[in-house]
Every structure is written in C-alpha cells, then in structure tokens.
C-alpha cells in the first residue's frame, strides 16, 4: 500500500485490512513515499517521520509491515520505480497495489503508466467523496473495493493539529503521541 501517510490514519488501516481479507493476501506492505512528486505544491513532513508513524501504526498487526524502499531510493517517488524494485526483490510474488479511488482516477497520468499494470494488480478503495470507476483502465488490471466508510483524511488531521484540535481516535494512539513529541503540523 503506497501513500504519503502524512499522517497515517485509521482509514488507511481499515482499507488495508479489508483488502487483505477480500483478496486473501499474505501480507500488506506499507510503502511511505520518499518525495511524492504529485504533492510538490505543499510541504510534506520529513520522510523519516512519516515512516516512523507508519511503523507505530502497524506494529501490532502481524499481517502488516513497512518498507523503506521509496525513502531510501532518493529523488522523486514514482510508483513505477517502487513496483520495479518490489518485483526485483520478490520475482515470484503476486503484487497488489492498494490505492485510494482519487489516486486511481489519476493513474494514467503517472510516470510509465502503461507499465504499471504489468507489474502489479491495482486495487482502488473508496474514499469519502470519490466515486469508484475503472473506466479507461486496462480490463483485469484493476479491482474496485468498497470499504467501511471512515470520513478521515490526512489533510484534516494535519489541520486539526495545527488548530490545536484533538486527533485522538482519528489516528492510532501511538501516532498521536509521535505527532505531539515531534511537534508535527504545528505551523500549517
């Protein structure tokens, strides 16, 4: 599951859990982006902070792990590079890339989009306010999944922290403590 995870929240975790169950996945690997190319218009928390928050949020689930593959590569993060690297590390694995419906709608604008579907099967999950559609995407290359609706976004979580509002129960407890300890999102 790729994402900025700035911060990771319960919506991400529920989506990963639902997809793992529906597709009988052995493992869900969370891959925080290093330098997300499509978010250059706004400040993004340090990659190490986003990685550590993701570790804190997923550590209790034995089916979840976190990869540094994008963070350690350096340069802008492109999904095609992530999938090429994961394929090289796991040549016999069936790779599934979990993403939000909003991101899936933009997938044909991503770098080397024609190659993406040969590297992994894409799973688009619902996000509040976004309609699921696979129109224009390769047949058999995408699955759409309904997940329990949680109207939580990382953008809202950052805004709440910046205003001094609580994010308890929106993000995992350990992530709340990490945000507080590192004074993240205070100046946004």
Swiss-Prot record:
What are the BP-aspect GO terms?
NAD biosynthetic process
* Catalysed transformations (reactions): nicotinate beta-D-ribonucleotide + ATP + H(+) = deamido-NAD(+) + diphosphate
HAMAP family xrefs? NaMN_adenylyltr
Q: Which species does the entry assign this protein to?
A: Streptomyces coelicolor (strain ATCC BAA-471 / A3(2) / M145)
> Its domain of life?
Bacteria
Q: MF terms per GO, please?
A: ATP binding; nicotinamide-nucleotide adenylyltransferase activity; nicotinate-nucleotide adenylyltransferase activity
Alphabetical list of Pfam families matching this protein: CTP_transf_like
Q: Tell me its EC number(s), please.
A: 2.7.7.18
Q: Which InterPro entries match?
A: Cyt_trans-like (IPR004821), NadD/NMNAT (IPR005248), Rossmann-like_a/b/a_fold (IPR014729)
Quote the NCBIfam families the UniProt record gives.
Answer: cyt_tran_rel (TIGR00125), nicotinate (nicotinamide) nucleotide adenylyltransferase (TIGR00482), PRK00071.1-3 (NF000840)
Role played: Catalyzes the reversible adenylation of nicotinate mononucleotide (NaMN) to nicotinic acid adenine dinucleotide (NaAD).
Its family remark reads: Belongs to the NadD family.
State the pathway, as annotated in the record: Cofactor biosynthesis; NAD(+) biosynthesis; deamido-NAD(+) from nicotinate D-ribonucleotide: step 1/1
Name this polypeptide is given: Probable nicotinate-nucleotide adenylyltransferase
Per UniProt, the keywords (alphabetical) are: ATP-binding, NAD, Nucleotide-binding, Nucleotidyltransferase, Pyridine nucleotide biosynthesis, Transferase
Query: PANTHER family, alphabetically?
Result: NICOTINATE-NUCLEOTIDE ADENYLYLTRANSFERASE-RELATED, PHOSPHOPANTETHEINE ADENYLYLTRANSFERASE
Q: What is the lineage of its organism?
A: Bacteria, Bacillati, Actinomycetota, Actinomycetes, Kitasatosporales
């Amino acid at each position: 599951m790729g994402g900025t995870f700035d911060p990771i929240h319960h919506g991400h975790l529920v989506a990963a859990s639902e997809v793992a169950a529906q597709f009988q996945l052995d493992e869900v690997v969370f891959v925080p982006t290093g330098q997300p190319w499509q978010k250059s218009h706004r400040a993004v928390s340090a990659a190490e902070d986003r990685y550590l928050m993701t570790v804190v949020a997923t550590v209790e689930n034995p089916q979840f792990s976190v990869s540094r593959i994008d963070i350690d590569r350096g340069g802008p993060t492109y999904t095609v590079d992530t999938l090429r690297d994961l394929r090289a590390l796991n040549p016999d694995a069936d790779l599934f890339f979990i993403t939000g419906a909003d991101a899936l709608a933009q997938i044909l604008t991503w770098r080397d989009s024609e190659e993406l579907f040969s590297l992994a099967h894409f799973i688009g999950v619902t996000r509040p306010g976004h309609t699921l559609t696979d129109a224009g995407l390769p047949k058999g290359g995408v699955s759409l999944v309904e997940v329990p609706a949680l109207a939580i976004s990382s953008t809202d979580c950052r805004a709440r922290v910046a205003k001094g509002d609580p994010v308890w129960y929106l993000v995992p407890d350990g992530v709340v403590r990490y945000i507080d300890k590192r004074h993240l999102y205070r100046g946004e």
